[in-house]
Amino acid sequence: MAAPRLKGLHHIKLPVTDLETSLNWYGRVFDAEHLTRFDHYDGAGVRYAVILQLPGVDIPIELRWAPDAAAATVGYDPVHFVAGGADDLQAWVAHLDTLGIEHSPVITALAGQLLIFRDPDQTYLHLLTVPEGGVLAIEMNPDAAEPEGPWIMPDLMRHP
């Protein structure tokens, strides 16, 4: 019997150590809109999660105040955004430079070009180029991989 068909992805949840710092950072970097009606509060009235909508991204991002989880996943790279083409990556380089955010150079890797930077909790975020036809149209290029670079393969993500 086949599995029931999924209808999509609801949201992405990222653990953070400081909700306000991360909310402000994602707002500055991505022009993220804070969807306040979805704020999560505990029984004591403490806000512990916020939902953001990033321009150009259909899936909302949840930032959840979870310091232990954020500390345990330093160096993890759970989210890979589509930036567009090579010119779009250069626009992101300029944007991140203007904000003073450290980032990788534009890297040519297995699945195209990418730019990598970290959020305030040291979660690695990737911006990738994608060809016409989308992700499934990517032709892998194993000769172009740069697996030993500190940006492309943080220690946490190295295989045994």
Task: State each model region's role.
Residues 37-42, 66-68, 107-113:
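Short, solvent-exposed loop/turn elements at beta->coil junctions and helix N-caps
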Residues 4, 13-60:
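Core segments of cupin and vicinal oxygen chelate
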Residues 59, 70, 134:
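Short, acidic Gly/Pro/Ser/Thr-rich loop/turn segments
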Residues 61-64, 126:
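Conserved beta-strand in the GNAT
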Residues 2-5, 9-17, 51-55, 68-160, ...:
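Vicinal oxygen chelate
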Residues 55, 64-66, 130:
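Generic beta-structure capping elements
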Residues 1-2, 64-69:
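Short beta-strand/turn micro-motifs at beta-sheet edges
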